[in-house]
Amino acid sequence: MKTKGKSGVMDMTQGNMAMLILSFALPLMLGNVFQQFYTVADTAIVGKILGVDALAALGTVESINWLVLGTIQGITQGFGILVSQQFGAKKEEALQETIFHASFLAVVAAILFTVGILIGLPGLVGILQVPVDIRPICLDYLYVLFGGIPLMMLYNFTAAMLRAFGDSKTPLTACVIAALFNIALDLYFILELGWGVKGAALATVIAQTLASAYCLWKLCRIEVLTEKRKAAKWRLHAGLCGKLIYLGLPMAFQNL
């Protein structure tokens, strides 16, 4: 199975297993840390510049953010299980077909999550018993942040696919770049433009966009994914969709 250029793909079925696992696991762990950094940066900067009420608002809704992010991460990681198995077995046609189905399910999930969460946000804030005086701040932040759920899904999906090909360094690089942009945009939107918590949320969405674009670009360089197949290979099959959901849902619940 070939790759295009320096795609970062690593065949983990050959070579020193201990070194392969270590070189794969370290960027994975660091990547998870940096992905959480978005909210940490928002909270620190908002608390320092906008004051106690804004800080309290972001701290209060943190559990909702982790709920959404954990669910998305779990689903996409579950999809990556089947992709990694087929990559290791060198089943190229099955690999393409699986990624096609996983992409379809990720798009559907992103749409459902975005619509459902944006509609249900006032109710969620109420369930959390957020103090009435900071609810508007909470909703201002969450509406902008969760309007970017499709981008959150895109990053986690492309990152999961890259990891399934043995490339855990690209998602880490994307996270580091995005985290730095997030800090810079936080300061610009809040200090210079005066956009408050909406600016902090928008900075996170833009940073996610950059991370998503970089991972997608790297994923598209993998040769096996650019080879053309017969049109029949791009038809949806309920069995394969069911298998991906079967792998994704338990991972999502485990992350809650």
Regions found by a protein language model. Give the residues of each.
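Short alpha-helical transmembrane segments in multi-pass integral membrane proteins
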Residues: M1-A25, V83-G148, E192-G248
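Residue-level recognition of specific faces of alpha-helices
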Residues: L20, Q36, T43, A57-S63, ...
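Transmembrane alpha-helix boundary and packing residues in multipass membrane permease domains
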Residues: L28, N32, A44, I81, ...
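Transmembrane helix-bundle signature of multi-pass secondary active exporters and lipid flippases
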Residues: L28-I81, L145-M152, G242-L256
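Small-residue-rich packing faces within the transmembrane alpha-helices of Major Facilitator Superfamily
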Residues: Q36, V40, L67, V107, ...
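Helix-loop interface residues and adjacent transmembrane-helix termini in multi-pass membrane transporters
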Residues: V40, I49-V52, Q86-A89, A164-F165, ...
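Small-residue-rich hydrophobic transmembrane alpha-helices
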Residues: L55-V115, M152-P171
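Alpha-helical transmembrane segments of multi-pass membrane transporters/permeases
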Residues: A106, M161-A184, L202-V205
